[in-house]
Amino acid sequence: MLTKLLPDQVAKFWDIIKFAVEESLPPIIGENPDKMNRILSSILSGKTQCWASYRRDGENTTFEGIALTKVIYDDASDTRNLLIYTVYAYNISAKESWVDGLLSVVKYAAAQKCSQIVSYTSEPYLVKKAKALGANTDFTFVPFNVADVCKTVANL
């Protein structure tokens, strides 16, 4: 089951969430020493959503995965999209768990009036699955570190 966590739940389970986020940060994240505090602040303020996939057996709760999403707005095109910022699975989850999770995220995106769900990944398996679901996988994310590019260009 995938559930959007409330701020008090995020605070309660922050150590578990923090590990998952650190293991799955996207390539746009710099080396700001305060990045995890900033991510936590963004979640607690509601700017970023934290989702937990978990299983309950009586009193025990087992986390299967953590995802962060964020509604992004492109003012040039007047478009709202839901960015899947991070996804982390603690263990290989059942197909039903991923399908249920994706449906939850799709419903959330629709409720937020998003026209697309967007993400980036370096996992070929996830690219293949996204393509099978109808995603356009023709684009390549190409990040440049500004300081490194400046040095390289200066040496041309």
Regions found by a protein language model. Name each.
Residues 21, 33-34, 76-89, 106-110, ...:
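Long, low-complexity, intrinsically disordered polar/charged segments
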Residues 1-35:
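Short amphipathic alpha-helix that is part of the acyltransferase structural core
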